[in-house]
Structure formats: C-alpha cells, structure tokens
Amino acid sequence: MKKITITDMKKTLIVGTVAYDDIETAKGSSGRVLGGSGTYIALACSHFASHSSVVSVVGGDFEQRHLDLLNKKGIETSSIEIISNGKTFYWKGKYHNDWNKRDTIITEVNVLEKFNPIVSEEFKTPDVAVLGNLHPLVQKSVLDQLKTAPKAIILDTMNFWMDTALEDLKSVIRRVNIIVINDEEAKQLSGKESLLDAAEEIQKFGLKYIIIKKGEHGAMLFGENQHFNL
C-alpha cells in the first residue's frame, strides 16, 4: 500500500453505529446525547474528506437535528436507514476517576440487531473505507459490496468480537490495511504481553499499520520496522 495523503480521502465510506449515549462521570451526567462510531468517524473525516457517506441504521426516535448536523458538515446521510417503528441503539455507561475504567449500565441494541448495510452505487468505489466497531460479518458484507479496492481500509474492533466471533474477525482483518484496537485487545488478539511483540504478531495478518489506543496515555502507531507514540 502506498503512502496515504489527505488528498487521497476525496471519497470516504464510513460504516458504523449512529446512536444515543448517556454518560456518567464523577462530575455529572451528560443525559441523552448523540453517539456512535459512525457519527464521530464521519465528523472527524469531514475535516479532511471532500465527500463522505455514513452507512448505518437508526430508529424513529432519532432526531432530525442530528441528521442536519451531519449534513451541514457535508456528510452524506442517505444511507442511514430509518426504521420508523424501531428505536435507535442506546448505551449508558459510567466512567470512574481512572478514565481507563468504565461500567456499562444499559445497552439497548434495538434496530442495530438486524442491521444489513447497503452501500450506495456512488460509494462502491471509495478512496478510503472505514469500518466501525461492528460484527465482523457486517464489516465483511460491506467489503463484499465494493467494486474497486480502496487506497486504505481501516478497521475498528473490540474484545467482544474476539470472544464471540474470532475466526470471522481474523478473516476480515486479512482484508484491511489498518486496524485500530486498544492495548488489552492487542494483547488478546496476539497472545503477547508486550505491545511491541503484540504489534509484530498482528502485522502477520498482512496489515500495513496498527494503531493501539492507550486511553489517557494516547496511542501507538506501528508500521513496518518502525513505531512511535501519538
């Protein structure tokens, strides 16, 4: 894979959750707020990609103002399916004084349980594809719909899928260039305790880059024969 630059991100396909969160901390509660991996990947990409699309699903309770927010940022939302008689994915959690620790209080999968992503014709030839944290088979179905190989495919995943769908996850990882996971997930996926050893083992899937998140301590980027802290 050649070096990716900002100009390569003209057309970016994003698949992930568009959701509602409720977050408690020692300082107070957010109440019901806009959340989801698809949402925040898209908002981040809006600073770089000239044209991006989010593929997701929401319920009839999803507020129009939140779609308007994405649209105002130049993000295509026509591939966000709205199931009028269903409810949007909802997560409530509590963070402790140690921000690396959190408790899940409520998870309501709702319409996401039967999410079947459909990529529009226009975005079957993206420059960059970003696969948010979803079931590996959902991520695979997106890759299967693409007509051309993107310059970069970025995959986010988590320990839950390693516990419940490991072989499916490994199959998808072999088809992407970049993976994003946290330090504990890197150790679990690789079977190694050292992050350096973990990254080296994970690169055997054929990955170009590995991003390992370390909470309040930032992240580490690993490439071929090199790594640095972010």
Model-derived regions, located:
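Positively charged, low-complexity intrinsically disordered leader regions
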Residues: 2-29
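Structural motif
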Residues: 11-13, 127-130, 152, 178
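Conserved N-terminal subdomain of the carbohydrate kinase-like
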Residues: 20-32, 49-130, 144-150
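Short catalytic helix/loop segments, enriched in acidic residues and glycine
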Residues: 28-43
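A short, N-terminal amphipathic alpha-helix
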Residues: 39-52, 201-204
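Short beta-strand scaffold segments in enzyme catalytic cores
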Residues: 43, 91-94, 218-222
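Short beta->alpha connector loops
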Residues: 59-61, 133-138, 158-162
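Conserved phosphate/ATP/ADP-binding segment of small-molecule kinases
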Residues: 147-152, 161-229
